[in-house]
């Protein structure tokens, strides 16, 4: 933080060798000329406007300041923003940044830089953070377009006050925000000082909208064509690209979720305001009554305004030229229409334009708040106050009084928190202190706002009296404050520099003369009911919404004046700021000509004086950078001392002393008050924070370990208890259900249908699996009973039905032949006895219990040679026998390993059984015995596999079959079928090995 050269000055005014005004100005000048526009007074940032772009706001600069302490880096507004963000995260308390200074000092830019920093460092804390940050940032250009204007002192002057709050969650990610606006200078819409502009949005709209859209709104891009814009004679500003800014605004509207219909309504309202400004009036004689009335002389502008507002042209014309007045009360109440003169009509026209713009601006702020507001979570906020600076013009009116009153309130807050309250706290805590004098502006604030005798109260009183004028109001304040040293007038002081319609206030920033002409009208802020009714009849939902119906209970109330509204808003703002931990930015305007690199010492000196910066330096230098309550200090830093960690039985003050002693803090560096410890140098606070940050990971690990152990033990015990309870409960429910089931199926064994019509009792969901198993057991038992009850004829019929289902329409089969199953057990088999003995041996060896099919077949071996074999299909396996001795060839093939069956649709007698590896496929000829047996073995295998697995085998009928009855992979054989009717030697079907992997079945068709 120490400057590189003496020419750069000291980075903190507290470090000056001499605390004098000249030394202060000299240091400020040196730093400004070396482009070091930021300087500290302790925690306060002093910012001078360089009137040029500086390369100190890059993303790399934000990263450099993020998470660093002030003393580690050169002075910067990012350092203050980082302090606010860190304080918010550490304490979970609301923070606010109060930016003050006169118009053109750089307050708006300062607020944008703070927002830029906060959104960047916080948006990566959660997925939603970046979206919220972008919406908060995009609200800035939108509000600037509608709320800022070019003035003589500032090309981008805020003509409204704004307090923007960013809300964060516990981890520091933005979750929402809120914008509160104060006193929009709506009079700027209809008039302003020569050389100034109206609000930016009018010029941006005219240059940014397409020609077709302008034509639709009845507009021309030529700004001087509109009375409201040409009055001041300023249309373009060299530092503002109106066309480019308009594109940014439209993009911001889209980001914030403003629908296209809303955008179109906004352009129509703005266009209507410009058309309203072009409406002129002329007097006309009323022949019937002989009186003079007023009428709209420019009907073209009237029609354009009515079209944009989507309201009736005639009703708008009447509302501008006539005023409805209620007479009498109750049943005698009547409404009469009173014509206005040209001046009154012009006043009514301007009032409508101002009301439209102000209500549109308030709607826009409300719309943004609806979009960015967070209602689901609560968390600390960081508020940024960007409000108009102190203003002194050649002609100062009601608006300047309110603006300067606002600055007086903020100066009073600064004095209360940094000068007055700080010194009072030292005395209250028993700290030795030499009092430092400062200018207290409290009497001026009371002069303006005090009730019942204050400028605002007297102005409200004048507005209540029908015959009051601006002059009678001036007379009343001159009389009331005749002896008040802070208010002067020509009547009281005979000072000829004060006009006879003016009074002068001695503000903290200097004397300002106010002209009372227009004070009453501006305070009343009257908009006649006829115009409100005309707007309420609009078919545009937005225009209607800007003028909501008056509630019956509100219609009897006297409307609050503009002055009272602003006073109440200011008091509410001060209450909000007092509830936050403040951070200050004091902006100084380097010169009035907006020249880069130039510093006007006289102008700067004046600002330094009225801002009380020198007194701030003296208090800061003589005082203490930090003060913390003993309890809070102990709770935050107790882990830094063995004697206070993890708990301490003494007082918080004693614990604080022990912590300071262990770290050898110099006695001159601290003072022990009655309830707080005072620390002189901020580096001491930073030292404790750094030590705490180093210690926290160890403590967090310890807490996590302890908590995880406790949680794991608790969960384990809970789980054991839960399992035990579940077991007992399930056992109870299962037993109860089984008792009900037993009663339901009591006589099921004697039931002819074995319980088919019995209703199963309802069961709880926890028994789903058990009930499924019980159902399965019952179904198996019932199926067994049904099968055992079937006669041989019934089973044979079932097989025929299945065979029909498989073969019908796909291959000819002998449906008349009886399925005898075991053909080898018949007496016709010459080796019957050998077969029977072989089957007995097979059953005892392999555990099979029944034969479903047995017959002689021709089996094709892996070499492609047909061999005569006996094939036996049992309840679980397929066996191959040598027909000579009936020995099992190799091993049996499980039926569940059969994956599909392939058969040709022709007249041959072959079939292929496809099996899972490592089993080989079977290629069988079942026609060697003189009868068709393909249908029987196919039906038997399909039926038994369905019984074993619940899956019906796929039977494919195809004229080309690929099979593999050899071990190696890739040794597939393609089998085709060829009918041959001219070979007398061919009997039945024959297998012919072809070349390569080809083979053919020859048969007589």
UniProtKB/Swiss-Prot annotation:
The gene is myoE. This is Myosin IE heavy chain. GO terms for cellular component: actin cytoskeleton; actin wave; cell leading edge; cytoplasm; cytosol; early phagosome; leading edge membrane; macropinocytic cup. Residues 694-722, 716-745 form the IQ domain. Residues 551-560 have a biased composition (Basic and acidic residues). It comes from Dictyostelium discoideum (Social amoeba). GO terms for molecular function: actin binding; actin filament binding; ATP binding; calmodulin binding; microfilament motor activity; phosphatidylinositol-3,4,5-trisphosphate binding. Myosin is a protein that binds to actin and has ATPase activity that is activated by actin. May play a role in moving membranes relative to actin. InterPro entries: IQ_motif_EF-hand-BS, Kinesin_motor_dom_sf, Myosin_head_motor_dom-like, Myosin_TH1, MYSc_Myo1, P-loop_NTPase. It comes from the Eukaryota.
């Amino acid at each position: 933080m120490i400057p590189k050269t003496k020419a750069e000055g000291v980075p903190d005014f507290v470090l000056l060798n001499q605390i004098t005004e000249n030394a202060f100005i000299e240091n400020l000048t040196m730093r400004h000329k070396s482009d070091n526009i930021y300087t500290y007074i302790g925690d306060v940032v002093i910012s001078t406007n360089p009137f040029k772009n500086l390369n100190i706001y890059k993303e790399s600069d934000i990263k450099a300041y993020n998470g660093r302490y002030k003393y580690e880096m050169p002075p910067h507004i990012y350092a203050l923003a980082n302090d606010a963000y860190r304080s918010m995260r550490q304490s979970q308390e609301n923070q606010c940044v109060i930016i003050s200074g006169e118009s053109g000092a750089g307050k708006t830019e300062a607020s944008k830089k703070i927002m830029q920093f906060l959104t960047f460092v916080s948006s990566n804390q959660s997925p939603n953070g970046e979206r919220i940050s972008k919406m908060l940032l995009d609200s800035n250009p939108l509000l600037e377009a509608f709320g800022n204007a070019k003035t003589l002192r500032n090309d981008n002057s805020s003509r409204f006050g704004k307090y923007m709050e960013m809300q964060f969650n516990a981890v520091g990610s933005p979750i929402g925000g809120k914008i509160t606006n104060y006193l929009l200078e709506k009079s700027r819409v209809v008039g302003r000082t020569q050389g100034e502009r109206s609000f930016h949005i009018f010029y941006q709209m005219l240059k940014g909208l397409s020609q077709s859209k302008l034509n639709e709104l009845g507009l021309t891009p030529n700004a001087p064509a509109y009375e409201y814009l040409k009055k001041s004679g300023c249309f373009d500003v060299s530092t503002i690209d109106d066309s480019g800014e308009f594109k940014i605004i439209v993009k911001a509207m889209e980001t914030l979720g403003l629908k296209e219909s809303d955008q179109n309504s906004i352009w129509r309202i703005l266009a209507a305001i410009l058309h309203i400004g072009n409406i002129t009036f002329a007097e006309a004689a009323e022949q019937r009554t002989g009186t003079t009335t007023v009428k709209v002389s420019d009907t073209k502008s009237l029609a354009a305004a009515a079209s944009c507002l989507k309201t009736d042209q005639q009703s708008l014309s009447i509302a501008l030229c006539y005023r409805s007045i209620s007479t009498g009360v109750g049943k005698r109440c009547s409404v009469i229409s009173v014509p206005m003169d040209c001046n009154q009509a012009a006043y009514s026209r301007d009032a409508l334009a101002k009301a439209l713009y102000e209500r549109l601006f308030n709607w826009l702020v409300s719309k943004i708040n609806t979009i960015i507001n967070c209602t689901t979570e609560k968390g600390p906020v960081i508020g940024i106050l960007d409000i108009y600076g102190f203003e002194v013009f050649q002609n100062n009116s009601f608006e300047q009084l309110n603006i300067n009153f606002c600055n007086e309130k903020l100066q009073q807050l600064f004095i209360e928190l940094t000068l007055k309250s700080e010194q009072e706290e030292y005395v209250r805590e028993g700290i030795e202190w030499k009092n430092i004098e400062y200018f207290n502006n409290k009497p001026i604030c009371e002069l303006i706002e005090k009730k019942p005798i204050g400028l605002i109260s007297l102005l409200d009183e004048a507005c209540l009296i029908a015959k009051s004028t601006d002059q009678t109001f001036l007379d009343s304040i001159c009389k009331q404050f005749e002896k008040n040293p802070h208010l002067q007038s020509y009547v009281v002081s005979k000072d000829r520099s004060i006009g006879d319609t003016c009074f002068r206030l001695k503000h903290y920033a200097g004397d300002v003369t106010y002209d009372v002409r227009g004070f009453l009208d501006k305070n009343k802020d009257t908009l006649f009911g006829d115009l409100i009714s005309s707007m309420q009849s609009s078919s545009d939902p937005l225009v209607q919404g800007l003028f909501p119906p008056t509630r019956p209970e509100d219609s009897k109330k006297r409307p609050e004046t503009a002055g009272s509204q602003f006073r109440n808003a200011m008091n509410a703002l001060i209450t909000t700021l007092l509830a936050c931990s403040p951070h200050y930015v004091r902006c100084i305007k380097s010169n009035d000509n907006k020249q880069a690199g130039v510093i006007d010492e006289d102008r700067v000196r004046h600002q330094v004086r009225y801002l009380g910066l020198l007194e701030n330096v003296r208090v800061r230098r003589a005082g203490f950078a930090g003060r913390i309550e003993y309890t809070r200090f102990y709770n935050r830093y107790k882990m830094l001392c063995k004697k206070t960690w993890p708990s301490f039985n003494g007082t918080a003050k004693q614990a604080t002393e022990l912590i300071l002693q262990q770290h050898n803090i110099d006695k001159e560096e601290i003072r022990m008050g009655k309830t707080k410890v005072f620390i002189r140098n901020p580096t001491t606070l930073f030292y404790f924070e750094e030590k705490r940050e180093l210690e926290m990971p160890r403590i967090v690990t310890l807490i996590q370990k302890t908590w995880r152990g406790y949680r794991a033990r608790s969960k384990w015990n809970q789980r054991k208890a839960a399992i035990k309870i579940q077991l007992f409960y399930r056992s109870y429910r299962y037993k109860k259900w089984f008792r009900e089931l037993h009663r339901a199926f009591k006589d099921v064994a004697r039931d002819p249908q074995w319980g088919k019509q019995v209703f199963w009792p309802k069961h709880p969901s926890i028994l789903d699996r058990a009930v499924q198993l019980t159902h399965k057991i019952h179904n198996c038992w019932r199926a067994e009973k049904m099968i055992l009850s079937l006669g041989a004829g019934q089973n044979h019929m079932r097989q025929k039905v299945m065979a029909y289902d498989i073969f019908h329409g796909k291959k000819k089969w002998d449906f008349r032949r009886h399925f005898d199953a075991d053909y080898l057990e018949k007496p016709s088999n010459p080796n019957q006895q050998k077969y029977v003995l072989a089957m007995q041996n097979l059953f005892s060896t392999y555990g099979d219990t029944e034969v479903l099919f047995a017959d002689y077949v021709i089996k094709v071996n892996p070499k492609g040679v047909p061999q005569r074999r006996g094939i036996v299909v049992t309840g679980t396996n397929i066996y191959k026998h040598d027909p000579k001795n009936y020995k099992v060839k190799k091993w049996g093939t499980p039926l569940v390993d059969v994956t599909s069956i392939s058969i040709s649709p022709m007249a041959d007698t072959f079939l292929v059984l496809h099996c899972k590896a490592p089993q080989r496929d079977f290629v069988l000829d079942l026609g060697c015995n003189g009868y068709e047996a393909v249908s029987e073995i196919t039906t038997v295998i399909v039926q038994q596999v369905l019984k074993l697995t619940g899956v019906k085998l796929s039977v494919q009928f195809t004229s080309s079959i690929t099979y593999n009855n050899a071990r190696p992979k890739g040794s597939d054989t393609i089998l085709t079928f060829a009918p041959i009717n001219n070979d007398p030697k061919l009997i039945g079907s024959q297998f012919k090995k072809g070349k390569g992997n080809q083979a053919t079945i020859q048969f007589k068709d």
